[in-house]
């Protein structure tokens, strides 16, 4: 079977091939989704088939001063906590892979008594998220343009994030790294899971959402094996959105609008 999508061709043996045709994002996506699911007996539509053209990311307003909201690894203090980042002792939560920053913008407004630190490896997205915070003058949220893994890691120099110092770790729709040889790059890797757990306080929560069932199942199994202190996985229910930005993240909005199941789980550290 051969499926023609916007600017791309996909077949089950070779995946995406040469670009063809003209860009048509509406009906062609729905046809692709239904035909592929029916032909291959799929229960969900794989996200790797959704590499549709995206609108260009708007550059932040040059009039906005992002210094208070956008940090680089060089800007960070030796120890990362609420006191060193925000100058107070409010509970600190970290989002790994903030993307365009919808979650950190919404959650920092909803819970002003908590601090939020978003980490995004792609600088243009980190800047976009920081601009959202700057525009709204969020005093309890900041963005880092950088890699989260070195910040959570335990090295010969010590720990950047102390044991039991975080109230929450959020990982939403991380890159699934489809090829088996690349899976070690996943955010929820063996070492990262151990470090996320180490950094959480007792009662702190690890949130993980994805639209990739294989990633979800493997991660739940891995956590049960190596981090039993996180307890049993607690499902997080889907709520109905009331407007176009009433979603956890932009990825959740896209997946739900295209009818793709989203798998959600939360862990509460027991000891």
From Swiss-Prot:
This protein's pathway: tRNA modification; N(7)-methylguanine-tRNA biosynthesis
CDD domains attached to this UniProt entry: AdoMet_MTases (cd02440)
Catalytic residues in the record: 175
Pfam families according to UniProt: Methyltransf_4
EC number in record: 2.1.1.33
Transmembrane stretches, start-end: none
Catalytic reactions of this protein: guanosine(46) in tRNA + S-adenosyl-L-methionine = N(7)-methylguanosine(46) in tRNA + S-adenosyl-L-homocysteine
Keyword terms of this UniProt record: Methyltransferase, S-adenosyl-L-methionine, Transferase, tRNA processing
Membership in a protein family: Belongs to the class I-like SAM-binding methyltransferase superfamily. TrmB family.
Protein name according to UniProt: tRNA (guanine-N(7)-)-methyltransferase
UniProt gene name: trmB
């Amino acid at each position: 079977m051969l499926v023609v999508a916007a600017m791309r061709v996909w077949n089950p043996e070779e995946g995406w091939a040469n670009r063809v045709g003209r860009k048509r994002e509406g009906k062609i996506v729905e046809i692709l989704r239904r035909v592929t699911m029916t032909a291959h007996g799929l229960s969900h539509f794989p996200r790797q088939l959704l590499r549709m053209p995206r609108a260009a990311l708007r550059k932040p307003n040059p009039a906005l001063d992002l210094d208070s909201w956008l940090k680089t690894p060089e800007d960070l203090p030796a120890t990362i906590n609420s006191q060193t980042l925000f100058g107070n002792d409010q509970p600190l939560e970290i989002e790994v892979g903030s993307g365009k920053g919808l979650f950190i913008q919404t959650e920092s407004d909803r819970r002003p008594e908590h601090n939020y630190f978003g980490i995004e490896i792609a600088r243009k997205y980190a800047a976009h998220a920081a601009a959202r915070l700057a525009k709204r003058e969020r005093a309890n949220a900041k963005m880092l343009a950088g890699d989260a893994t070195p910040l959570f890691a335990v090295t010969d120099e010590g720990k950047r994030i102390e044991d039991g110092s975080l109230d929450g770790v959020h990982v939403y729709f991380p890159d699934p790294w489809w090829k088996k040889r690349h899976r070690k790059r996943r955010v929820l890797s063996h070492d990262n899971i151990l470090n996320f757990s180490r950094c959480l306080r007792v009662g702190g929560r690890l949130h993980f959402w994805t639209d990739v069932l294989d990633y979800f199942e493997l991660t739940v199994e891995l956590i049960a094996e190596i981090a039993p202190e996180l307890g049993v996985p607690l499902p997080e229910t889907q709520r109905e959105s009331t407007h176009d930005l009433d979603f956890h993240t932009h990825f959740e909005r896209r997946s739900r609008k295209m009818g793709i199941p989203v798998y959600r789980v939360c862990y509460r550290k027991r000891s």
